[in-house]
Amino acid sequence: MKVMKILHIGQMIGGLDIYIRNSIVYNKVAENEYVIACGEEDKHQPVIKNGTEVQEIPIALYRSLNPFKDLKALIQTVKAIRREKPDVIHCHSAKGGIIGRTAGWITGVKTFYTPHAFSYLCTPSKLKRWVFMTIERLTRFETYVLACSESEQEMAIKEVGYSKEHALVWHNAVPDSSLERGKMVDKSEPYACYIGRPCYQKNPLFLLDVIKKVKDRGCNLKFILLGVGYHSPELDAMKAKMHEFGLEDSIRLEPWINHADCQEFVRKSLFYISTALYEGLPLAIIEAMANGKAIIASDVVGNKDCVRNGENGYLLHLDADAYADKIIQLVNDKELRTSMEKKSRALFLEEFFIENRIKYLQNQYNMVYNLRYGGANLVLLKTNIDNVILVSVGYDTTLHHEERRVAA
């Protein structure tokens, strides 16, 4: 098999940086070559693969809609594709997805799109949701959506209109973060941990309602909220509500810190909390599971793909009293907490440990590569939900049950 060149398109920020970086660094296929087209103002460390820095192409890729910058990014990306001649494009999130899918369509290169939570979920405005949904549908082209969870895959088919043949799935997966060591954390007072920018998606104002309920019931648990920094549109509203509720002594806000220090906070916590309105598949929860933490999370897309209700944590509707009930229960019941911690760790190793999961991402790349070049025989594997997956002969065809839910 000749070298397969894979072009990633997306901002190297936060969870996208982790996803792109891990999918390159932990892929052991020697024949792969990688290029990253990322935002010209992204602040990140270079990706090192086998001792060599992966080539990056800066483009005008920004979060907000800007017709002039977006057109510039598209032109830059098309030029990069024609110059680099990738075999496969893998584009990420809303803006990278629009640019990448359109550029792939223009140049005729097979394209994967991982939404990391569809863009139309990001706003309560019905008009904006309709606009974002329309953009998602208009830029489907012949793209393969590569969802990061089954619930995101289902959404791609039922709401965005992807065919089952073009709706694939590969779970977000991460290294074993329990092995990382950061700065020492003061754990003299027990605390619960939460990671996320103060923004609409992460629902921080509801979290404050929960914390107030917990405090009003006489529970002195502290809360450490990590990731307060880059692009935090609800931070001022959050601080105002903390003051209104008198929660300054109950909450510690931590700015954007390095990954090892962040994981140290998670490791020393009693358990992990998420109040998100939606997710793709949350890396923060997966890393909390790697650290053997019980999870209390909202019952939404993404969260429900990694939390088994009543086993490694709880999935809850957005009801502050229900959250307070489970928080206080886990604070007081060490035996239950320990049981859930063990289950979280086991689920991580089984379903989300990247060294066990990366081969399934490569299988997806191989499938599309071989459809493009026709250079290998393809095997049709029936799945347990009457879908089909194509896998090239000569590669690992023993698919985990989660990957057997996809259609290709």
Where are these regions (language model features)?
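Glycosyltransferase donor-sugar binding loop
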Residues: A37-K43, I195, K222-A237, P255
